[in-house]
Amino acid sequence: MSKRIAGPEIERLIQLLAKVPGLGPRSARRAALHLIKKKEQLLSPLAAAMSEAADKVRICSTCGNVDTADPCMICTDPRRDAGTIIVVEDVSDLWALERAAAMNVRYHVLGGTLSPLDGIGPDQLNIRSLIDRVAGGEVKEIILAVNATVEGQTTAHYLTDQLSGFDIKVTRLAHGVPVGGELDYLDEGTLAAALRSRTAF
């Protein structure tokens, strides 16, 4: 049993920080110490921001994004192409695509991927509302931006099957060589996907 090195409030802060993805126990201790040292500049404003987020953040009933409004800012933006929806696994994927700023479209967050071994079927994901959005008639293209994992591919095939009865185009992100990537450092699966996804030059 490890010795306690601080009061219960500090220990609780460290334990909670350690649950944040990317922070292990050591990183959580360092983060907690930094926050405590910068109490006025960081800890107090962070606590206030987290409390406000807990009160005001909602899940968008249209697309599954997180925002302080429902529907979210993306779904209500009239400048976005409502005819194209990019389907992603998680909100973090949506944010990554938004940072790339490649397309001004709408999104749909599934909340994960199909994984029968983990007990995750279609009913556990945000799939029914995607079908309902497509059935509304405004959507012309669905872009499947799921990860290139077994579960991601299973989900993509399932969605393609579910959307086959609609007069829409279903596409998927190309997989392959990253910008600035050297072929010698890529794995065989990535190279094979790049060859299959080749385009005219």
UniProtKB/Swiss-Prot annotation:
**Superkingdom to which the source organism belongs:** Bacteria
What keywords is this UniProt entry annotated with? DNA damage, DNA recombination, DNA repair, Metal-binding, Zinc, Zinc-finger
* Gene Ontology molecular-function annotations: DNA binding; zinc ion binding
Q: Which InterPro entries match?
A: DNA_Rcmb_RecR (IPR000093), Rcmb_RecR (IPR023627), Rcmb_RecR_Znf (IPR015967), TOPRIM_dom (IPR006171), TOPRIM_RecR (IPR034137)
Looking at the keywords, is Transferase present?
no
From the UniProt record, give one GO term of the biological process aspect. DNA repair
Which parts of the sequence belong to the Toprim domain? 83-178
Where do the ZnF regions (C4-type) fall? Answer: 60-75
Give a short account of what the protein does: May play a role in DNA repair. It seems to be involved in an RecBC-independent recombinational process of DNA repair. It may act with RecF and RecO.
**Similarity comment: family membership:** Belongs to the RecR family.
Protein's UniProt name: Recombination protein RecR
